[in-house]
Amino acid sequence: MEKGRTKVLIVLLIIVIIAAGGTLAYKLVKDKNKTQEVTGEENETPIITKEEKKIKIFSGNDRPIAVMIDNHSDAWPQAGLQDAYMVYEIIVEGGETRLMALFKGADVDKIGPVRSARHYFIDYAMENDAIYTHFGQSPQAASDIKKYNINDINGIAEDGTTFWRVKDKAAPHNAVTSTKKLLESAQSKKYKTTSTKESVLRYTTDEVNLENGQGAVSVTIPHSNLQTVKYVYNEESKVYERYARKKEQKDWTTGKTVTTKNIIITFCDNYTLTDSENKGRQGLKNIGTFDGYYITNGKAIKIKCIKNSREEKTIYQDLD
């Protein structure tokens, strides 16, 4: 690791998770009898990051496309997460979480189910210079899309064209899309489809050995009383397998377990917004410097995560 800044070396899918509500217990399990636990204050939230092995997708200058993915249990299984190079998971209202998957240079026939925008996800779309895809939006997200002049693709206006409905899931958990459809929509709107912006993280196929890291063969993140996510390290395949609500998460298209190579957790506060609709929508205090963890190959190290503005990319610093 480079001093002052982590070389976040991505080989598999990146997931960024923000857990909400209650006391957050983040566990690094060495073995069945030894557990190290880091406990946050109430409403302290982690962001987790994972990555994908298709390094060829970073050889070009294709602009990323971000897609909001439904994570309600009625939406399971989801499609496209394993094809994304980065996925953010953040708390939303009702104790649920939502995912934002990023695609670059990928050809994915089915992505979804697609759900509505939340304003703090826009921060991470901006730092990745991504076209932002959603199906509807909260009032705060609608305001920010206009305020920041976000290049977005909204399923409300493109249902039946860019998006289609599947019969094996009930609305609102049944809208899907594809990278081909999204690119066609972006081109029709005359959005730029290339980008020269530097990636948020550095990518390599080399293995990362966290020699001085603490054991992390099992990582548990209770976002709320409703949603607990767990990653279990498979020593044979050298990836983390994803579980949610004690269920192994499967890919909708392949039926295989959803996996990741690298995880980044950032701890920051979330809170309930006060608005006229009173739906319990969340806000996120994600601007500043926060504690975090980088996790890969069954080990974890502490890091600092710095985000100076909503538009600027997050910087991850090694503590060494």
Regions found by a protein language model. Give the residues of each.
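Residue-level detector of intrinsically disordered, flexible termini
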Residues: 18-19, 24, 185
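A surface/extracellular/periplasmic glyco- and lipid-processing/surface-interacting theme
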Residues: 5-7, 36-84, 93-320
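Hydrophobic single-pass membrane-insertion segments
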Residues: 22-37
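N-terminal Sec-pathway targeting helices
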Residues: 2-17, 27-29
